Amino acid sequence: MSHPLDNIPLLPHVLSMDYNVIIAGGGLNGLTLALALDSAGITTAVIDAFAPQESLSPKFDGRSYALSAASQKMLDALGLWEDLAHHAEPMLEIKVSDGAAGETPSPFVMQFGVEDFSQGPMGFMVEDRHLRARLAQATKASNVTLQSGQTIINQTIHSTHVTVAIDGHRPITAAVLVGADGRNSRTAKTAGLTRTGWNYNQCSLVCAISHEKPHHGIAHQYFMQSGPLAILPLTQNRSGIVWTEQQHVAQNIHSLSDADYLDILRPRFGDFLGEISLAGSRYIYPLSLSTTHRMIAPRVALVGDAAHAVHPIAGQGLNSGFKDVAALAEVLCDTRRRGQDLGIHTTLVEYQKWRGFDNAVLCTATNSFNKLFSNNNPLLRGIRDLGMGLINAAPKLRKSFVATAAGAAGDPPRLLRGEPL
């Protein structure tokens, strides 16, 4: 279907640039943005510090992602989902409750199911290794220029373009530079985009387990004194574990043998899935909050963790990054259709307005949830148990929660509605 702006001719460019857009960082957000822009005919180069043999190693990242229904629609719109679908496990139900090792589950439970979301599964669990491999495969088959194992050493902003200097290679130019280079974003720092953040003194212990009984597509989240424990359904009778502990405790647990590790996990996990065993390597990730005050600077925009790295308590980190990707791709695509310079201030301001407030809310919410739920204060525990019970008893409120988590609330970008750019 043609877009109303498709028939507006492009204005002649005074400067011949190497690309329309340069993306710093070839992770999940960076490659997804590159493929989205490529689908709209916007020439893109991705500069990634990791060599392919590093980033595509099955042990590069042990995490799994709870992709929202909207994120799944975007991947489908970009032609990525068909090959990913057999690696994805639908989330049909979510149960949230207080918990403690060796205790019976709290009677106050928030339970979200198919009756709360009429559009199908609320989300899909996908392992990092499968998503990363599919993005790499699609990038190789696209018109995107991927320069792996290369490091950006400088960026210079001009009135008409940005020049990026790459260690050991010639500089390249584009209308816009996008920072998708993570929470320690060099792009953001060089652009003068200041950050706020702190460490939580917590780490997430991450692994996959095999279990005796089927999970039936149910995701569980228990709020323990030290932090949340998430049990997330994966394919082949496996579940992904995201187990948060205080930093020193987590480091001690991570250093244990597999057998001792499981001995500590079992009382927290319970026996509802029968006997459990490790189904791969174990990982540990320190947790922190890191957010920039703005997502844009002259000819620079940030996406994903480069702009907002949050606590995993709500499982929305990658989904939030994909919202950035969809919004930025849309405003750049529409600017191109109008025949305008992709890096003009009004375009980047539109992106900031679209995503800035939502990301600020996410940072505030995840930080507040972590403070509220990562403790065993009897008063706070009583308040949160009462709150969960009230939400569970209110169908309209449950549906609102699910719509927000699924990315279906508000006015999402076209890609998140499953529509092409």
PLM regions and their residue ranges:
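Conserved N-terminal helical subregion
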Residues: 15-17, 87-190, 198-203
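N-terminal FAD cofactor-binding segment of flavoenzymes
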Residues: 59-101
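Conserved Rossmann-like nucleotide-cofactor binding loop
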Residues: 29, 52, 184
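Glycine-rich FAD pyrophosphate-binding loop
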Residues: 38-63
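N-terminal Rossmann-like FAD-binding beta1-loop-alpha1 element of flavoenzymes
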Residues: 19-46
